[in-house]
Amino acid sequence: LGAAEVKISLIAVGKLKEDYWKKAIADYEKRLKPFCDFEITEITEGKSLKEEAQNIKKKLKGCVIVFDIHGHMTTSEEFAEIFSLNMNRGVSAFSLVIGGSEGLDEELKKAADYRISFGKVTYPHRLMRVIAVEQIYRAMTIINNLTYHK
């Protein structure tokens, strides 16, 4: 699948306000352009995780990956492999979900194709966006045999 054919959506609960996070994400968004059509969708924090999950579900397309501290501890190579295996099967859309400060609804996590964790530490959900976008970029460079990942 070519860059124009792969769509990656990062769906995140809450609004990103800080310019320093926005700048970091913008840098990786620019770097991702040769590899995919990338977008971030912000979901308003709901009164409950169930309400947030309903709003998230409306945005999900293709392969669904949720970030969950209790998910499979994933290396950068394994994360890249998720994309690679699915793209080789013809999957062209990926939805990656980051919960808000209260996490994600359990049913939403169970329904995902992948539940992954980048470690046992808890990250602020705003920082997790930067980490996720960087790891998506890293995954694309691994798949394309570029030297970014060492």
Name each region found by the language model:
Residues 5-28, 32:
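N-terminal beta1-alpha1 ligand-phosphate binding loop
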Residues 10, 65, 99, 132:
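Conserved RecA-like P-loop NTPase ATPase core
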Residues 11, 41, 65, 114-116:
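Hydrophobic/aromatic beta-strand patches that form the interior of the parallel beta-sheet core
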Residues 16, 69-72, 100-103:
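Short glycine-rich anion-binding loops that position phosphate/pyrophosphate groups of nucleotides
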Residues 35-94:
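S-adenosyl-L-methionine/SAH cofactor-binding core of RNA-modifying enzymes
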Residues 94-107:
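Short glycine-rich, acidic/polar surface loops and turns
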